[in-house]
């Protein structure tokens, strides 16, 4: 996969302030505030920064945590996992494999079949209809 690389100024000009803060500066949207937290429509969730398909809506579930949650990415190669020790915690950050956008974190407390919970900020993704 060919990487997309831009300067922070280029990203800032493309994204709204909240998208920039979360996707490029590794921020977090407030729980229960994102537009996709309760979303039930079918489709594919894409990276807001580069359009890479990330999650199938059929893998979305209600974790009750305040952020959209998925039990699997559309492909393992769609994201990169990075050890995150910020805020006094040990977590696994997930970023877009194509543009390095911060998406959220993955936790080992999800449902079958994977047992994983990809906890993703709504501002980082865009739900599109299936082709």
Curated annotation (Swiss-Prot):
Sequence positions that bind Zn(2+): 47, 50, 96, 99
Entry annotation: catalytic residues: 119
GO CC terms in record: cytoplasm
GO annotation (BP), single: response to oxidative stress
This protein's UniProt keywords: Metal-binding, Oxidoreductase, Zinc
Cofactor(s), by name: Zn(2+)
Catalytic activity: L-methionyl-[protein] + [thioredoxin]-disulfide + H2O = L-methionyl-(R)-S-oxide-[protein] + [thioredoxin]-dithiol
SUPFAM superfamilies to which the protein is assigned, alphabetical: Mss4-like
GO MF, one annotated term: peptide-methionine (R)-S-oxide reductase activity
One Pfam family in the UniProt entry: SelR
Classification via InterPro entries: Met_Sox_Rdtase_MsrB, Met_Sox_Rdtase_MsrB_dom, Mss4-like_sf
EC number: 1.8.4.12
MsrB domain ranges (all copies): 8-130
Family indicated by similarity: Belongs to the MsrB Met sulfoxide reductase family.
Protein name: Peptide methionine sulfoxide reductase MsrB
Gene name as annotated: msrB
């Amino acid at each position: 996969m060919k990487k997309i690389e831009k300067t922070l100024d280029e990203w800032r000009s493309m994204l709204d302030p909240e998208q920039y803060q979360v996707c490029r500066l590794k921020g977090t949207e407030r729980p229960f505030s994102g537009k996709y937290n309760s979303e039930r429509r079918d489709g594919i969730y894409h990276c807001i920064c580069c359009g890479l398909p990330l999650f199938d809506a059929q893998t979305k579930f209600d974790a009750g945590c305040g952020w959209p949650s998925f039990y699997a990415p559309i492909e393992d190669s769609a994201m990169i996992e990075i050890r995150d020790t910020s805020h006094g915690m040990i977590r696994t950050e997930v970023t877009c494999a194509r543009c390095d956008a911060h998406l959220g974190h993955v936790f080992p407390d999800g449902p079958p079949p994977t047992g994983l919970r990809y906890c993703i900020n709504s501002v980082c993704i865009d739900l599109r209809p299936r082709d």
